[in-house]
């Protein structure tokens, strides 16, 4: 981060008074910019003992197989995000969902919340 999103001035990477770790702080307006982990919502969609996978169409890892998952949008629940990603990435409708697992990948600041459910009528498409 180089510039303040509040006023556009430059920022410094310092530990604010009363805090215990470095943050980006605006040199002009003193706004503290907190950078928090991103939440990834995804779905393990099952159909007749098979799992739905998607082939990645973009980087990173273009062409490799993955579960339908992605960044949450504002104003949606993690379940809504997981269902949206399944629909966007595989045109898949998933029912009877429940939270399957959560895990963190600290070095890239991501928290994953994966749901498990049934692929409706075994249908999905690119």
Describe every region a protein language model picked out.
Residues 72-126:
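Unchanged
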Residues 21, 62, 110-112:
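Short edge beta-strand segments in beta-sheet-rich domains
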Residues 3, 23, 44, 53, ...:
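Conserved hydrophobic/aromatic beta-strand scaffold that supports enzyme active sites
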Residues 46-88:
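Conserved Nudix-box catalytic region and its N-terminal flanking loop in Nudix hydrolases
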Residues 1-42:
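Acidic, metal-coordinating catalytic segment for phosphate/diphosphate chemistry
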Residues 35, 61, 106-108:
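Short glycine/serine/proline-enriched coil/turn segments at secondary-structure junctions
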